Amino acid sequence: MAVGKNKRLSKGKKGLKKKIIDPFTRKDWFDIKAPSTFENRNVGKTLINRSTGMKNAADGLKGRIVEVNLADLQGSEDHSYRNVKLRVDEVQGKNLLTNFHGLSFTSDKLRSLVRKWQSLVEANVTVKTADDYVLRVFALAFTKRQANQVKKTTYAQSSKLREVRKKMSEIMQREVSAVTLAQLTSKLIPEVIGREIEKSTQTIFPLQNVHIRKVKVLKQPKFDLGALLALHGESGGEEKGRKVNTGFKDVVLESV
């Protein structure tokens, strides 16, 4: 049997292990700040390779999209079924100033809404806000039993569904086009548009579980640093945002 070289045997210094360098020593951490529309502005942290030579770290950070659960931004589990996308638009020191970039429902929430014996109504519109953001807004609703109804099912006729869908599109077009993106975010959090749709369609067919399930930013205007700083309260250092007005007043009961 021919005897060959044993490649597993180390040959002097060649067998020594190379020095392992931790890649995180060449990276910097940055704090992600949400707009003041939300209660909790500290979203989290992200990292990137440190600036070297002609390569600036800020260029790699701008445009990053982060997805956060709305419950974390509002500090309430009542909003846990919605996720918000934020886009990094500006770097200030170690703070990343973000802007609203989209909203979506979680898949488990959508599945929990679909039930038998009812009709699903969906509508979507492409609309421009007052500050020239082009958005595509998706809404969904479900039919519900009418007052004193005996029949188990709540299926609606096609003609009724078309009327409801047209009304939903009109309301979304009107509500979104009249406000800025920041004002629209304040409407989306307490679901003002969904309640308006539910109220306006009562004469056509009663609805339930009316939601704006998704918002996509298709086009954004030219970047305005002043508007972004105003959205963040002139500086990215504040940790708390302003409280969103839900449009309802607390009812005070008289003592008996």
From Swiss-Prot:
Report the InterPro entries cross-referenced here: Ribosomal_eS1, Ribosomal_eS1_euk
Going by the UniProt record, its keywords in alphabetical order are: Acetylation, Cytoplasm, Ribonucleoprotein, Ribosomal protein
Q: Which GO terms describe its biological process?
A: translation
Q: Which GO terms describe its cellular component?
A: cytosolic small ribosomal subunit
Q: Which residues carry this modification: N-acetylalanine?
A: A2
Q: How does it assemble?
A: Component of the small ribosomal subunit. Mature ribosomes consist of a small (40S) and a large (60S) subunit. The 40S subunit contains about 33 different proteins and 1 molecule of RNA (18S). The 60S subunit contains about 49 different proteins and 3 molecules of RNA (25S, 5.8S and 5S).
Protein name in UniProt: Small ribosomal subunit protein eS1A
The encoding gene: RPS1A
